[in-house]
Amino acid sequence: MSAGNGNATNGDGGFSFPKGPVMPKITTGAAKRGSGVCHDDSGPTVNATTIDELHSLQKKRSAPTTPINQNAAAAFAAVSEEERQKIQLQSISASLASLTRESGPKVVRGDPAEKKTDGSTTPAYAHGQHHSIFSPATGAVSDSSLKFTHVLYNLSPAELYEQAIKYEKGSFITSNGALATLSGAKTGRAPRDKRVVRDATTEDELWWGKGSPNIEMDEHTFMVNRERAVDYLNSLEKVFVNDQYLNWDPENRIKVRIVSARAYHSLFMHNMCIRPTQEELESFGTPDFTIYNAGQFPCNRYTHYMTSSTSVDLNLARREMVILGTQYAGEMKKGLFSVMHYLMPKRRILSLHSGCNMGKDGDVALFFGLSGTGKTTLSTDHNRYLIGDDEHCWTETGVSNIEGGCYAKCVDLSREKEPDIWNAIKFGTVLENVVFDEHTREVDYSDKSVTENTRAAYPIEFIPNAKIPCVGPHPTNVILLACDAFGVLPPVSKLNLAQTMYHFISGYTALVAGTEDGIKEPTATFSACFGAAFIMLHPTKYAAMLAEKMKSQGATGWLVNTGWSGGSYGVGNRIKLAYTRKIIDAIHSGSLLKANYKKTEIFGFEIPTEIEGIPSEILDPVNSWSDKKAHKDTLVKLGGLFKKNFEVFANHKIGVDGKLTEEILAAGPIF
């Protein structure tokens, strides 16, 4: 025997324990209760007997609400919560209906991955009917019609985060709390793949032909793509549905429904559209416009009018949009903007691609400008309220933001340059195609490995000085921004109505393009109404509405050059941002209206001779150029580019006698 460790071994290698004192039994108090069960009294216990029951206690069900409108409240009082949900699901099922079978899928609310806590196995569902004149009912049954489609309806950002992290590869929570996502192969819009149905109505109403962004398709091809998108969405186990609004003006808002397959798309639209209250959702009803986003599934290249596997299709008569072959979320935002460019003018409301802010005294300014002109920077002013950064309507009562969020560029973003955007990137924000550290999840905004078009989509409430609701009175100033790399446009010019229309239609800025030998020269670019890719009607129609509203409200037009002075790019210098801000401040305060003005040659601009805090020599470009002949030659060159661009609009008559067209043409460069 060996007892070196206090134990003993027997001869066959087994263990035996020494005789003697043993450890006392643990006393639990069980005997006092008359039971042999051991009880742990060390802490409180939960009111659950299973782990599923415990999980069900973690989430409190949202209490049913009553519509704010008293009449609606009376109507809903007799309708149970279950009946309201059934009506809601029937509407969604109808949206997802195949137009050949004329019946929608069996839809049920909730995530299919979550177990039901009531023990039921077959969820209550709704079936929706869709009556169409396109094709007769066939009564055909498909595999997708035999299964349930789970609808994740108007989920909160937290719920959408969970869905994205669980099921979408490439979705991560960054160190600042934002959701980083990838948009797949497409990291920007595909304007060449955008199509608009040309029918008896749009034939005469829309702008077609040279210079137009509207590329036609026929009704049949749209229906083929619609069926393809709907079949794809119905084949999925779950889809995301957002019911939201466009336009903060309550008299002219539009109800939109977005059906998508990705949490990324649902959160993006949650941020970009106006978010309804629970009361508004209960009485939402049938949407005015529906988007079917099947972007993960390609279109059929052999279908007529298709040029690639991507197709973004608008049918204004059906008020539907179909997305195939691109997961870039910006297609939804700009697709709806195009719809507003069609619907709002029918109500005599001007839709505008502009920024908008308001002073503490209620003075409103509109900012128009292409990429790189400073529209976002100048419209975001800590001394003024932000109404919106991109899309607006000008109604009979004032201005309103179309959207409920902002879609800001992130490339080279810094806290110092753009503090408002930097601070808005937090929990709830979608960060699109950014690069981040694999361990710390800190975003590197200077890294363009995925794309230069990195973006952040966040609710407008994330901006501290946002005006909620996003509406304001009639604008006092209409500011057209141009980054003139030719260096011949004045830092600021006061425009008459005809000049405002001419430069609004032109939509000018200049880009700096590099060449192989390192020489860089400016390239003029023009985009009608500062947003040609999104307008539906002829540009002159929007310009005429703008002039009419400016005239009736006494608004002043301004052209502000944020580009070069003292020479073209490579010779002159960029106009200091501090000078431009002083100009904008003088416009806001009204002091610039009181300045002394003189007229320039070629373009005939009215320019101030003096502005406090700005060197007088830069106010007239010719004074800042050392080579006067080079200035004149460059000025004539730019004037020629304006004339050439405007040729496509010259023959379009506005009004009965075309007199307005003549006034606009006369407001252009003369030499």
Curated annotation (Swiss-Prot):
GO molecular function: ATP binding; metal ion binding; phosphoenolpyruvate carboxykinase (ATP) activity
Ranges where the record places region Disordered: 1-44, 100-127
Binding sites annotated in the UniProt record for substrate: 189, 328, 334, 455
Main location as per UniProt: cytoplasm
Bias (Basic and acidic residues) ranges: 108-118
E.C. number(s) listed in UniProt: 4.1.1.49
Tissue: Expressed in cotyledons, flowers, siliques, seeds, leaves, stems and roots. Localized in mid-veins.
GO BP annotations listed: cellular response to phosphate starvation; defense response to fungus; gluconeogenesis
Regulation: Allosterically activated by calcium. It may represent the only case of a monomeric, allosteric enzyme.
Pathway participation: Carbohydrate biosynthesis; gluconeogenesis
Gene Ontology CC: one annotated term: nucleolus
Cofactor(s) annotated in UniProt: Mn(2+)
Residue positions binding Mn(2+): 334, 353, 390
Keyword field: Acetylation, ATP-binding, Calcium, Cytoplasm, Decarboxylase, Gluconeogenesis, Lyase, Manganese, Metal-binding, Nucleotide-binding, Phosphoprotein
UniProt note: phenotype after gene disruption: Strongly reduced phosphoenolpyruvate carboxykinase activities in veins, leading to reduced alanine levels, which is derived from phosphoenolpyruvate (PEP) via pyruvate, but increased aspartate accumulation, derived from oxaloacetate.
Modified residues (Phosphothreonine): 66
Catalyses which reaction(s): oxaloacetate + ATP = phosphoenolpyruvate + ADP + CO2
Cofactor note: Binds 1 Mn(2+) ion per subunit.
Subunit field text: Monomer.
NCBIfam families (alphabetical): pckA, PRK09344.1-2, PRK09344.1-3
Name of the protein: Phosphoenolpyruvate carboxykinase (ATP) 1
UniProt lineage: Eukaryota, Viridiplantae, Streptophyta, Embryophyta, Tracheophyta
